[in-house]
Amino acid sequence: MKIEYLSLQRITQQHADELHKAVQRVIDSGWYLQGKATNDFETAYAQYIGTQHCISCGNGLDALTLIFRAYKQLGKLHEGDEVIVPANTYIASILALTENRLKPVLVEPDMLLQLDVTRIEAAITPKTRAILLVHLYGTCAMHTIISAICKRHNLLLVEDNAQGHGLKWHEKHTGSIGDAAAHSFYPGKNLGAMGDAGAVTTDNNQLATIVRSLANYGSNRKYVFPYQGLNSRMDELQAAILMTKLTYLDHDNQRRRYIAKRYEEAIRHEAVTLIKPRNSVFHIYPILCKRRDELQQYLASKGIETLIHYPIPPHKQACYAAWNSLQLPITERIAATELSLPCNQAMTDDEVEYVIHSINTWEKTI
């Protein structure tokens, strides 16, 4: 049996007729940017997330960058201000901060691979102005302790919801629990476009107005530019595709949860550690294994594709050479042992059981 980590073709085929019709409507309209499809998606996604505003943009990194840039325009952030961020995050979270001349303060994760709330206050200094909460792997990173810390220290709470589409915390969707949130619709996400796309959600009217301007060259009306902005817009085709797929997001996430539950119930191997998050939409299903590379090669020999999220943490990347000497042992251990198993709505039950059987019989079949 051959199992891809993620087959975008199979996922697309599940709703191919509807997607073809949605794309055809855009083609026939003759309007390909900033039109009805984009407006409709922004309205629907804001309603789904539970915020007053959704501002579409070009990708998830731009969404994060625009949020911090807008807060600088509002005077809430200034160059050199510190932002607490999980050390094991994807590098986009860090890039959005350094692009805005803000200082990332890397905090180690907990046993669920999320920002460790018990380490946050020790990382706060007089220059700390915000927490960037990343719902890594599709697992909710929010905690009542984080709310209390933000109130106590007057900190902004910004969510990186790139991996958390459809996730909830206390009956509220992630993307609505902080001051603002960034969303990525990269094709491989739980809610994925057929190209790059992103969005910002917020209840802050001022922030929303500035983000929308910044995403459109800094313009608030044609040929008038109060800000130095970006060219970061979602096109009509991506909006129409996302509008179609949004209808199925909760159903797709239920399938992911079922697969994760089967893994948790049935994978039994002394060399494999299961994370077992309590609240997740399983954008990624991570396991930990000290012999990760051996296991990955073995699964490949069985036709099972796996990935690593992420093999080199941000503080060890060449682009952040000044941090290379930092000692973050938990983050580094995750980078050395994490392996992501296939877990998506297009998988069949037989494929899921084959992954389980292959792991459980690792070494017994050699």
List PLM regions with ranges:
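N-terminal "arm"/small-domain region of PLP-dependent enzymes with the aminotransferase-like
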Residues: 1-31, 302, 342
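Phosphate-binding glycine-rich loop
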Residues: 31, 36-82, 96-100, 106, ...
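Conserved coil-to-alpha-helix start sites within the AMP-binding
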Residues: 88-94
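Short beta-strand->loop structural element characteristic of the AMP-binding/adenylate-forming
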Residues: 103-112, 307
